[in-house]
């Protein structure tokens, strides 16, 4: 898809005529097929209107733990490579009329191949319910799709293999570095993990773990009886804790705690969300179906930015 084609599509998606046609089609009401055709995908779905797409982006950020922490970028053309800088940003002082002397920096970038992983979800509703004149179908569908996508995305952002889904932070070779190895998680191990992360990444660092691990850490004390968890503001060593139940529990061979700057985890949106209405497939059951899909990739572009605790056997 070329940039010109994308711009033309975006312009059409912003028009009120397209918005009206899209939502009438979603409710199986008469609609302008020529208007809707402007947003039809090669899979027979239709892209969300511009305003609805903005709502979807906001809803996904609410539903996905990672979307609120990661760097989100857009790469909707067919290009499949990004360059990420892997050095300390360069700067220098110079006299008022002096010249800056910087290197060319060409060797400071790492090339990453970006894929287009397709994520889909099927929603089914009672026909009478979806045709109810009082139903806010736009917000209802957006909320349902975002809940489904958000849950599936986070699972991949943690454990994804990078083949048919994004590469997760716990990937053995392309994920976060191991900061601490332990056979029994202690107060000291958590402190060690914190300081295993370089100061520049600790500055915006956050913790990530599941509920079971969080419960354990809430009870963890040092030898003086001091809790490691600040129960007043839910922080550990002054840094906020984010619960993601796709993280593993404390067990042999697992990585139950991650800490670092999650802005170095990049989520690359390859195509916007589209919805296909299944008018006939579930008609005999008195239902109407919707298939929503999106294309994206994600990966940790600086492995030292996030570190994990590895529990040994």
Label each region the model flagged.
Residues 58, 84-85, 91-95, 102, ...:
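Short helix/loop capping segments that flank catalytic or ligand/cofactor-binding pockets
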Residues 162-297, 305-313:
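Extended oligomerization regions of viral-like shell subunits
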Residues 1-112:
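Assembly-associated, polar helix/coil segments characteristic of icosahedral protein shells
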